[in-house]
Amino acid sequence: MKILFCFVLLAIAALRASVINRHNKRFAGFSVAGIGGTAGCVVVDNKLFANSFYLRDLTTEEQRELAQYVEDSNQYKEEVKTSLEERRKGWQLARHGEKDAKVLSSLAEKKFPKPPKKPSFCSAGDTTQYYFDGCMVQNNKIYVGRMYVRDLTSDEINQLKTFDAKMTAYQKYLSSSIQQQVDSLFGDKSNLFNLFTDTRHETSSQPSDATTISTTTQAPVEPPETPHFCIAIY
């Protein structure tokens, strides 16, 4: 049961990370609604690409910004490596009973280092892709496959902004609904550490009152209507 619960939590964590922390792909195609991955920004010889599409050459100031980002990224990678090593050693000691529950709980809740801020030339507007039936929109430009078609009109840009806001709200609603269903089944055990310590200490701990799970339900959020930038024939 605990193994199953662990997988459920990992799935929810991945979904939350996608919905809240990433500017990725927005899908509104035939029988599709969700979020996928993205290559983001890539710079080669000071040429800027977004999701493999060439945008422009970097300015001198942007090149300096890129150099600082590379330096910060290298430092971030070292901090993450150190943090993971601390956790690995902590869990190894826990397996041999050399650390108590409070110390391990503190270790599990310790925050990971924050990644460096993206350069200003790699914004959500540059990298977000909107997939519709038959075409894709990126940076307010319509593509069919990899072929550029045209820029969006002012009215179409407003339609896209409205769609993005509604799709984001819909995806957050889905994530919240899944979390509520898991909580109703297993209770609020969002800390993975508890999965492996509850059984060890349950014989010495005093019985506690059952956790009351909130039965409040959100008003359903419907998926937004898809903008008609292109027409696919099936």
UniProtKB/Swiss-Prot annotation:
Stored InterPro entries: Pepsin-I3 (IPR010480), Pepsin-I3_sf (IPR038412), Protease_Inhibitor_I33 (IPR051901)
Sequence ranges of Polar residues compositional bias: 204-219
Transmembrane segments: none
Cysteine pairs bridged by disulfides in the record: C135-C230
Keywords in alphabetical order: Aspartic protease inhibitor, Disulfide bond, Protease inhibitor, Secreted, Signal
Annotated region described as Disordered, given as residue ranges: 200-222
Signal peptide region: 1-17
Protein task: Aspartyl protease inhibitor.
Family as reported in the entry's similarity comment: Belongs to the protease inhibitor I33 family.
Protein name: Pepsin inhibitor Dit33
Gene name per UniProt: DIT33
